[in-house]
Structure formats: structure tokens, C-alpha cells
Amino acid sequence: MANHKSAEKRIRQTIKRTERNRFYKTKVKNIIKAVREAVAVNDVAKAQERLKIANKELHKFVSKGILKKNTASRKVSRLNASVKKIALA
């Protein structure tokens, strides 16, 4: 265990940040999964609705500093391509 106050504080901070990061990581995965599930069953309306939500949420995470801008853009772009694919089919 830590012998210094500063080391104990760093441990507390790491635990807190790990929990926060896990929460957001799970949220990102669930958002993407929701869109992919709608695409899998070829439900265009639901997929487009969920894509709109995903776009908003992922870019909100960018503004909070959770995701990098290019990462969010890449994820949205790939989701958009999959939704567009079923919309045209």
C-alpha cells in the first residue's frame, strides 16, 4: 500500500477516473450497439432515429474530452454508412 499522502491520493483519483471511464466506455458501446441492432433487422426508421441519437451523444463526448474528434467522426461515419446501405436496399 501507499506510504505517502500523495500516493494515497493518486490511488483514489485513479479509482475514480477508472469508474468514470468505464461508465462512458460502456455508454459508447451501447449507443453503437443500438444502431447496429436496428441495422441487423433492417428497420430503417429505427436505425435512422438511433443514428441521430448516436451522432449527438458521440459529439457530446468529444466536447467533454472523453473521445477524440476523429474517433467520434469515424464511428459516426461507419454507422451512417451502414444505415445508408439498408435504406437504399
Swiss-Prot record:
Q: Which UniProt keywords apply?
A: Ribonucleoprotein, Ribosomal protein, RNA-binding, rRNA-binding
Family annotation (Gene3D superfamilies)? Ribosomal protein S20 (1.20.58.110)
One Pfam family in the UniProt entry: Ribosomal_S20p
A GO CC term attached to the entry: small ribosomal subunit
Reading the lineage from the top rank, the first entry is Bacteria
Primary role:
Binds directly to 16S ribosomal RNA.
Among HAMAP family, the record links this protein to: Ribosomal_bS20 (MF_00500)
Family under the similarity heading: Belongs to the bacterial ribosomal protein bS20 family.
What is the protein's name according to its record? Small ribosomal subunit protein bS20
State the organism of origin: Helicobacter pylori (strain Shi470)
